[in-house]
Amino acid sequence: MIIVTGGAGFIGSNIVQGLNARGITDILVVDDLTDGHKCLNLADADIHDYMDKDDFLRRVEANEDFGPVEAIFHEGACSSTTEWDGRFVMAVNYEYTKSLLGWAVARKVPLLYASSASVYGMGPTFRESREFEHPLNMYAYSKFLFDCHLRRFAPGIDSQVVGLRYFNVYGPREQHKGSMASVAYHFHNQLNDSGRLRLFEGADGYGPGEQQRDFIHVDDVVAVNLWLLDNPGVRGIFNVGTGRAQSFNEVAHAALSWHKGSTAGGGIDYIAFPEHLRGRYQSYTQADITALRQAGYEGEFMPVEVGVPRYLEWLALRD
């Protein structure tokens, strides 16, 4: 059996789809379906069972078994970068993951967990090393602290444990995330609603819409996860991005190009940069994927010119 925590969420449900594509259906999905809309992410998936995350955590902390477990993909977390309830974030993102690590290591079960590029703060270097890590919010700090925890104990661990520092992921099954969904998702909806896009004006020395992020399609994220499943000797913390920064304007133009002829207008409106985000906003990210390549991963990554149209095709079938 393979366990996927956060399996009804964005990346988790796509990992389930990726496993299904391999013919793997002996999957235990762990999640919190308080927001029942997330069940739609699993409506076309084949799984063995579902378990509420609180029940799962109680069983993990009680050191109970779940039968033979091949691997754990730990994607469950509070992913809101604007959540400042530190006790809540630390309980969900840090303590939960520590408990799961102890359970997995004791049984030599591979644990592949979601970290985040947010640990790097404002950058400008995005490499998996302590001197470049400067988290700016509770979410980032919780991810950073667990990465530090792993580093302390890694020398004594003889099973696979991998932290994946996801950069700006976009793609299918993120609709439940609301304001935290990708700009590609919001651009699609804006064009459907009004035919125009809204982007922030310039900040931190960047012109209007010229802030840059490393945007990675969720299919590429899944490919990295499945490669790690196939390569249990690979361990450590790795950036998962394309290795190329692209501007929000480039994402916007990819969306506009796809929508061309199907919507009225098609312009971009630049809006004032929010004051509450100044000093807390990553205006530039670009994954250094040297470590991932050196570990042996050879897969190619989609630029936004390819990934965004692919995603919008998927969304259009469900509009």
Swiss-Prot record:
Binding site residues for NADP(+): 10-11, 31-32, 38, 53, 75-79, 143, 169, 177
UniProt EC number: 5.1.3.20
Molecular-function annotations in GO: ADP-glyceromanno-heptose 6-epimerase activity; NADP binding
Domain of life where this protein originates: Bacteria
Pathway the protein takes part in: Nucleotide-sugar biosynthesis; ADP-L-glycero-beta-D-manno-heptose biosynthesis; ADP-L-glycero-beta-D-manno-heptose from D-glycero-beta-D-manno-heptose 7-phosphate: step 4/4
Required cofactor(s): NADP(+)
GO terms for biological process, alphabetical: ADP-L-glycero-beta-D-manno-heptose biosynthetic process; carbohydrate metabolic process
Subunit structure: Homopentamer.
NCBIfam families reported for this sequence: heptose_epim (TIGR02197)
Entry protein name: ADP-L-glycero-D-manno-heptose-6-epimerase
Originating organism: Aromatoleum aromaticum (strain DSM 19018 / LMG 30748 / EbN1)
Gene from which the chain derives: hldD
